[in-house]
A protein has these predicted regions:
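Membrane-interfacial helix-loop segments of redox and metal-homeostasis proteins
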Residues: 1-167
Length: 167
């Protein structure tokens, strides 16, 4: 696996090196689909798209064993091809999903409220963040999660475990 892919997998909270060579492409299904939905929502300026996405992403963050995108990957790709399925998301990935839910909710509510300038700004920020994942393999919310954990650990003098110590 390329180093940038290992970095992405590691920052999502999975151990590296990982025995599953399909993990990177499995993890990328969600940002690709979310990116497509954000492009559609932005293009048509439909709050329903963002509000539905907010609900789906919030569900993924709050009930990680029932993540719709992971289930879609498992039932359409992993099981038919006999490759390892995605398991429950580690904390950095759930934090990223929660962040996506909050952004989607903000975009949807901005459109509902008629605050189109705010909606465009939020949509632009979301598209840049998604492009960062898809092009650079760098997830801003997962990095923020890691930075917040390090900061809280040093502030309170308590060691904080890391899901993946090899990053």
């Amino acid at each position: 696996m390329r180093r940038s892919r290992e970095f992405f997998v590691c920052h999502q909270g999975f151990p590296v090196p990982n025995a599953n060579p399909h993990l990177y492409s499995a993890l990328m299904l969600q940002p690709r689909m979310v990116g497509g939905l954000v492009v559609i929502g932005t293009g048509f300026q439909r709050p329903e798209v963002f509000l539905a996405l907010a609900a789906i992403m919030a569900w993924a963050a709050l009930v990680p064993s029932q993540n719709l995108f992971d289930a879609l990957y498992n039932y359409t790709i992993a099981y038919p091809r006999g490759v390892p399925s995605l398991r429950v998301a580690p904390a950095p990935r759930r934090f990223s999903q929660g962040f996506a839910a909050a952004m989607s909710l903000a975009m949807g509510l901005a459109l509902v409220a008629g605050a189109t300038t705010m909606a465009w700004i939020l949509e632009g920020a979301a598209l840049v963040s998604i492009a960062s994942v898809l092009v650079r393999r760098f997830c801003v919310p997962a990095h923020l999660y890691d930075a917040l954990r390090r900061t809280s650990s040093s502030m309170f003098g308590m060691p904080v475990g890391h899901e993946s110590p090899h990053c």
